[in-house]
């Protein structure tokens, strides 16, 4: 017997008060459910994105990494030499903490480099912003999901080498932060996009968010990534690819 029922019977026996009305548990559950579904989303402005982008560039650690990646990709833009591609993979693994090196039992550096080099017209397709390259890299040899790495590899080549903003980055910080800005979006949906390498759906979500907030600055995809990462990251927590 619940404490509420005890209290109701006690009052009835004393005659001091009318019995408490029974609580409609279904109504309570329904009201709670409505409250849970009602979630106020945050908004974005061009100024917010620009500010955090500049903060990233000014960061003594991450800003220098950003400039190093830009310099190396401009110097070695093509993806036809397995040895150079291997070096670029290692660069991304180090600067972005994609942790590919921790999964040598699933894929090794030489194999991943061969997969990238083996993609037909890779560089031209990056220049054109071809989204189909991302899932090819992400699925790699079929033993590991490299979705986050693939988005970063393509995004940085597009931005640094060709000066275009056609790609968007996925990582754990974005997955956790994005639902704060998109009504009805849940992390489980984003995780499904990652696990199935559905880059098209993921990018469409990002584009809809930017359009809904009238974000029209140059490199808006790249600056959104910097905004979300710099605002919501946990400095002590390394991102894991898996």
Task: Set out the residue ranges of the language-model regions.
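C-terminal accessory module of base-excision DNA glycosylases/AP lyases that mediates lesion recognition
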Residues: 1-16, 20-91, 166-242
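Generic structural signal for hydrophobic core residues of well-folded globular domains
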Residues: 7-14, 93-99, 137-141, 153-158, ...
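Residue-identity detector for glycine
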Residues: 15, 61-63, 101, 118, ...
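Aromatic-residue detector
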Residues: 32-40, 47, 130, 140-145, ...
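Helix-hairpin-helix/helix-loop-helix acidic hairpins
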Residues: 79-145
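Catalytic DNA-binding helix-loop module of base-excision-repair DNA glycosylases/AP lyases
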Residues: 134-180
